[in-house]
Amino acid sequence: MAAALALALGLALLPSPGRRSGYTVEWFQQEAADVPDQAFIRIYTKAALPVAVKQQTAESTPVWEYNLFIREENGVGVTVSELTCVRFYKSGKTDIYASTVDVFGERNGGRPSYIGGREMRRLSCGRTADRQSIGEGWMLRGTDDHGNPVCFTTYIPFERYRN
């Protein structure tokens, strides 16, 4: 009962994707509760943090590159309603990118994406490095196979670009 109340309160306090200032780095860094018999998705990277700036040659564009892993750990699948990436800038501004269908590039005809129990997905992320960006927050929302609304987040900090 307490876990369900905490989840309901947490979902009620989610930032609105339409509000530009609703997301914070701290919000993306919060750990989600691992509730028994409910989907639990871990979103992470194996890259050293902060993600380093890479530049192949002096003439090439500097980038931040990392793989984002999304793994369900409780054996309960999730129908994904939204995968959102928020890029944070030193100025406090954000850019918000959200996908609601085919979020993993499955080309499934516009139907919602699905992550099965104990399944892992990987996204390759490459961003042009600049002096203003400080990192990206990732959020996955959906409904698990038991009808529970779920939301999971992570924050990926970027190495400071000094060119």
Where are the predicted features?
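Surface-exposed binding patches on compact interaction domains or structured appendages
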Residues: 89-111
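A eukaryote-biased signal for short, well-structured alpha-helical docking elements
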Residues: 20-38
